[in-house]
């Protein structure tokens, strides 16, 4: 029964000290940037009813959810996604729109063992709800680019894709649901050989414009030249409109001076089925991991109430932290500047002194040791060079200079002592 008591479940890990501080800083900087741009915060429970994620299209694989029962026998899940609970809130609360919201929290999704992915991650994101024009997508992309700049993330790019174009192709070529799952994988992984074999096995006419577009789809990545290629092969107004939307977003962001942070990839297809239009994926070159994901989901909120257009982007906080650790100087947690050793009957005075000293920007801590020598040893081990002793009769400041020496000694009043 105690076999696993010293281990973490698959796909989880402990975060210690500097890394915890860095995660907190990343979350706070993202939150601050989004709030400054007019987003309002929403928080949803870590646990949700299974039914929240089990509507008709089944956007999240049931096997990837952590499920258990509540006290009434109802199925509960650890939230595997942040967008769907937000859609539930907006759909059931009948919020006024347009609405810009931000969130941050942990997401739990069971990945395959040894896949190198964590099953618990931290996501911070934004959603623009109630707007169906390109201003919503543009707002989301600008917000995320600015937040990554403020975090000093280097060498990142956000790819703009269009799942609506892919869905138009699938519909026009009458590709069945089971076959489509394989097709999606071939395009996403840019597996040209398997895609070519798929077209051959399906006996699709390679002279047909839509088939040509399908075969080219994984190769359509880069800048606006990609759009020109796709437009030549678009065989319906719906396809042309889908391509034009990507073009409008790209051009608008480029004109703002953010062209170096964006690219087009019409072979990008999100694994979550609730996306209906433009989609986004962001990467950092050095780590090759996805740091941003999202897109337009105009039909999702309708599962919980009124049908509302919406678009959103999620930032993978853990991956950002990993990138910052690799790109920047090793993060050093702020050391304690002053340690206060006190006799128990001087606790109140010691705490007042701690409050006074920390107002000068110092990191000040009360000693946990009853013996002054133990406090000295702890201070040396942790590179603390100043110890203040709160004695019954006086306050004494010690400084390390190859040994502990008295720097000053004074009245019992912490205010007077600080001013000396």
Swiss-Prot record:
NCBIfam families: hisZ_biosyn_reg (TIGR00443), PRK12292.1-6 (NF008938). Required for the first step of histidine biosynthesis. May allow the feedback regulation of ATP phosphoribosyltransferase activity by histidine. Heteromultimer composed of HisG and HisZ subunits. This is ATP phosphoribosyltransferase regulatory subunit. This function is generally fulfilled by the C-terminal part of HisG, which is missing in some bacteria such as this one. GO terms for biological process: histidyl-tRNA aminoacylation; L-histidine biosynthetic process. Pathway: Amino-acid biosynthesis; L-histidine biosynthesis; L-histidine from 5-phospho-alpha-D-ribose 1-diphosphate: step 1/9. Belongs to the class-II aminoacyl-tRNA synthetase family. HisZ subfamily. GO terms for cellular component: cytoplasm. GO terms for molecular function: catalytic activity, acting on a protein; histidine-tRNA ligase activity; transferase activity. CDD domains: HisRS-like_core. The keyword Nucleotidyltransferase does not apply. It comes from Bacillus anthracis. Gene3D superfamilies: Bira Bifunctional Protein, Domain 2. It is found in: Cytoplasm. InterPro entries: aa-tRNA-synth_II, aa-tRNA-synth_II/BPL/LPL, HisRS-like_core, HisRS/HisZ, HisZ. The keyword Amino-acid biosynthesis applies. Keywords: Amino-acid biosynthesis, Cytoplasm, Histidine biosynthesis.
């Amino acid at each position: 029964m105690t076999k696993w008591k010293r281990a973490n479940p698959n796909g989880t890990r402990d975060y210690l000290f500097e890394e915890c501080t860095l995660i907190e800083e990343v979350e706070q900087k993202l939150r601050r940037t989004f709030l400054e741009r007019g987003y309002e915060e929403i928080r949803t429970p870590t646990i949700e009813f299974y039914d929240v994620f089990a509507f008709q299209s089944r956007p999240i694989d049931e096997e990837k959810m952590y499920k258990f029962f509540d006290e009434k026998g109802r199925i509960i899940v650890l939230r595997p996604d942040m967008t769907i609970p937000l859609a539930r809130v907006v759909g059931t609360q009948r919020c006024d729109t347009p609405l810009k919201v931000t969130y941050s929290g942990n997401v739990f999704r069971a990945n395959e063992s040894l896949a190198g992915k964590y099953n618990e991650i931290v996501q911070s994101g934004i959603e623009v709800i109630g707007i169906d024009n390109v201003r919503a997508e543009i707002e989301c992309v600008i917000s995320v680019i600015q937040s990554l700049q403020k975090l000093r993330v280097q060498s990142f790019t956000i790819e703009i894709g269009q799942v609506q174009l892919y869905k138009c192709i699938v519909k026009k070529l009458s590709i069945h649901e089971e076959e489509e799952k394989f097709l999606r994988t071939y395009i996403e992984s840019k597996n040209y050989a398997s895609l070519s074999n798929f077209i051959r096995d399906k006996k699709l006419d390679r002279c047909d414009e839509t088939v040509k577009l399908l075969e080219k789809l994984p190769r359509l990545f880069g800048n606006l030249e990609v759009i020109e290629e796709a437009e030549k092969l678009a065989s319906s107004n719906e396809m042309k409109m889908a391509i034009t939307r990507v073009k409008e977003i790209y051009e608008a962001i480029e004109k703002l001076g953010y062209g170096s942070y964006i690219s087009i990839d019409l072979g990008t297809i999100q694994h979550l089925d609730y996306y209906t239009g433009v989609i986004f994926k962001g990467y950092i070159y050095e780590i090759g991991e996805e740091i941003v994901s999202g897109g337009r989901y105009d039909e999702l909120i309708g599962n919980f109430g009124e049908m509302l257009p919406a678009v959103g982007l999620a930032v993978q906080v853990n991956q950002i932290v990993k990138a910052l650790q690799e790109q920047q100087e090793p993060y050093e947690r702020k050391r304690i500047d002053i340690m206060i050793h006190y006799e128990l009957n001087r606790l109140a005075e010691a705490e007042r002194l701690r409050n006074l000293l920390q107002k000068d920007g110092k990191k000040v801590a009360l000693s946990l040791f009853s013996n002054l020598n133990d406090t000295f040893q702890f201070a040396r081990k942790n590179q603390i060079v100043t110890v203040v002793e709160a004695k019954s009769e006086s306050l004494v400041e010690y400084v390390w200079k190859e040994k502990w020496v008295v720097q000053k000694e004074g009245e019992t009043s912490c205010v007077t002592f600080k001013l000396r």
